[in-house]
Structure formats: C-alpha cells, structure tokens
C-alpha cells in the first residue's frame, strides 16, 4: 500500500458526490494520477462495506475501466489513487457547443464511445458489479479517444444520497424508471437504461430526460416512451411509487424526437438499438453483451471478445 507522501497534490479537479478530486503526481514514477479524497466521519471511521467494495474495484482491470491503483487510509480520510484521464464525456460534449446551441457528436464517434462504454460495462456485469450512477461526467476520455468508466462501485460503497442536492440532480436524468418508482430489485438493467440516455445525449448534445425531481423525471420519460401498463410491464402497478392516476400516453417516435437535433440521418439499426436500451420494463432491456452483438455494431464484431 502506498503512503500519501509518495504523491504530490496538484490542482483541484472537482468535487464529486463523495469526494474531492485532485490531479496528483507519483513522485517515484513521475506518472500523473487522480487523487480522490473521501472525508471520513470522525465518529464512524470508514464503513467496512466501503473498504470491501473498493478492494473489489482494484481487481477490475479492463481497458475501458479507470484503474484504481491504490487506496491510502489515514485517520480522517481515504484517498483513492486512480489512473489520470484528460477529460470526461460531459466536458467533451460541452466543448462542442456553439453559442448556446448544444451540438451532438458525429455518429461514428458516438458509436465508438458507446462500444467502449458497453465493453467496460459488460466486463463489470460479468463480475457481478453494477455501476448504478452512469452519466457523462463519469465517463472519462483520454487524448487517444479511449473512453473509460469511472466511479465504479462507489455508489454501492458509499450509498447514493437519497435527498438529491441540486448539483447532484444530474444523476436523476440517467436513472431508470423502475428505480424512480421505488423498485428495490436492482439488476444490471439499471445501467443499461443509463447507457440509452447517454447515447441519445451524444447524438443531440442535450439530455433526453432532464427532470428536476423524481416525479417530473418519470413524466418526461413517459411523455416520450409512453406510459407503462401491466401488459407491457407486468407488476409495474405493484411498485411502491407507481401512480395509478398518471395520464396514459402512447409512445412517441423516438427518431422524430432526436432527428431535428442532428444533421446526420438516424438509421433503423441505431434506432432499434436505442429502443433496446430504453425499454421501460427492465426485463426487456438488452444486456450489455447482447448490446455488443447488435447489428448497429456490425463493423466492430471482429474486435469483440
């Protein structure tokens, strides 16, 4: 285990849900790292579950997952030493905004990023680990165009705060309808929903469902995807936060929702793929592995694992 004296703390990169992040330098190797500092409650110390989850993350070695090199545990803080990445998908998309007009990414780049996102996700799901908090801010990109998933396991290690603060409302935009309606049976499908939201946002440059609270979030989802019912989603009416008085709406044509915001034509394969991710019923969503074998990715098959 490293000691904190091995690292020189450089500029602050940002504040996350759990931690403050700094750029750091490994004084021994000269390699840049990201230092994520989690302040510990002086009363309680580090929850053992957090340590357990974090040690799991150290075992997650994949080219599309940000490497966790080490964990430094001192009395009042936990410092996670991560591989340093130059950028994240949110900042990358923001940099393309012209004036106040968001711009989507070129579709070949969208496909390349989505492929890498699903490669990393499939690896984690095979290892029985959910992300739970996928959003453009924690998809990190380096100068070579490699995309890697960050913050894996942290949602589980530290718990997602229930009272979503304004800065954290972003997480809502990528949250699956089953979770919003109080489902406790989380499975890998919650990450797949987030992937669908991220895909739509890469195409248009704008979040697909930018709600400000759980109720509005569901309304935005149902306005586009249609209102769920028992025939489409058995047992939906039994979810704790299901609202029986919600106005029944048919689904809108997703291509018509997205096409005005991009110059490139959205083909049938892409739309079929997106529908496979954004199924209201979690049991109907594609798995990460199935998604990687979808015809939209045909040109990548020969690289597939």
Curated annotation (Swiss-Prot):
It catalyses: L-seryl-[protein] + ATP = O-phospho-L-seryl-[protein] + ADP + H(+); L-threonyl-[protein] + ATP = O-phospho-L-threonyl-[protein] + ADP + H(+). This is Cyclin-dependent protein kinase PHO85. GO terms for molecular function: ATP binding; cyclin-dependent protein serine/threonine kinase activity; protein kinase activity; protein serine kinase activity. It comes from Saccharomyces cerevisiae (strain ATCC 204508 / S288c). The record marks 166-167 as: Not phosphorylated. Pfam families: Pkinase. Disruption phenotype: Increases GCN4 level. Monomer. Forms a cyclin-CDK complex with at least 10 different cyclin partners: PCL1, PCL2, PHO80, CLG1, PCL5, PCL6, PCL7, PCL8, PCL9 and PCL10. Interacts with GLC8 and RIM15. The keyword Kinase applies. The lineage of its organism: Eukaryota, Fungi, Dikarya, Ascomycota, Saccharomycotina.
């Amino acid at each position: 285990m490293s000691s904190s004296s091995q690292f020189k703390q450089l500029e602050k990169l940002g504040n996350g849900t759990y931690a403050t992040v700094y750029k750091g330098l490994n004084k021994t190797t000269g390699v840049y790292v990201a230092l994520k500092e989690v302040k510990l409650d002086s009363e309680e110390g580090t929850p053992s579950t957090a340590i357990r989850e974090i040690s799991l993350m150290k075992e997650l070695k994949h080219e599309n997952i940000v490497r966790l090199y080490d964990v430094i545990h001192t009395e009042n803080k936990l410092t996670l030493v991560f591989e340093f990445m130059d950028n994240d998908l949110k900042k990358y998309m923001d940099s393309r905004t012209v004036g106040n007009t968001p711009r989507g990414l070129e579709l070949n780049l969208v496909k390349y990023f989505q492929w890498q996102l699903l490669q990393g996700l499939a690896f984690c799901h095979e290892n029985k680990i959910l992300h739970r908090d996928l959003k453009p801010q924690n998809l990190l990109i380096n100068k070579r165009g490699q995309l890697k998933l960050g913050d894996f396991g942290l949602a589980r290690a530290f718990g997602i705060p229930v009272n979503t603060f304004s800065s954290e409302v972003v997480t809502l935009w990528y949250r699956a309808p089953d979770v919003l309606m109080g489902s406790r049976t989380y499975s890998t499908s919650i990450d797949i929903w987030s992937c669908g939201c991220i895909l739509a946002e890469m195409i248009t440059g704008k979040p697909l469902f930018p709600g400000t609270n759980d109720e509005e979030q569901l309304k935005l989802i149902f306005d586009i995807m249609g209102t769920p019912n028992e025939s489409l989603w058995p047992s939906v009416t039994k979810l704790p936060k299901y609202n029986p008085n919600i106005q029944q709406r048919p689904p809108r044509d997703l291509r018509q929702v997205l096409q005005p915001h991009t110059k490139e034509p959205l083909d049938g394969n892409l739309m079929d793929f997106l529908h496979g991710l954004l199924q209201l019923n979690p049991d109907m969503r594609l798995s990460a592995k199935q998604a990687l074998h979808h015809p939209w990715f045909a040109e990548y098959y020969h690289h597939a694992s």
